[in-house]
Amino acid sequence: MDKLKKHEQICKELNSLYCRKNADYGDSFGKSYEEFGPVIAAIRMGDKLNRYKALIKGRQQVNDESVRDTLIDLANYAVMTVVEMDMQSGGDAE
């Protein structure tokens, strides 16, 4: 598989995970973003980045999340933040 196809596959995976989590938890990120603004995105992504750093340094204490899982979550938080920014501005970045 070439890198363009792999990127497309990962983006589909991101969307699938986003849909499943929204079905389970509702739009909790959107509600938090509405209440606290961009700072909530920085906090959530900061938590994931700290988790990533702990994993790559071998300091993991919980075995149920891999480096890949953490990076997927981090990517989804970045996309969700762009969605909230676009929704607030009433625009679509396309």
Tell where the protein language model's regions lie, with residue ranges.
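Intrinsically disordered, low-complexity regulatory regions
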Residues: 1-94
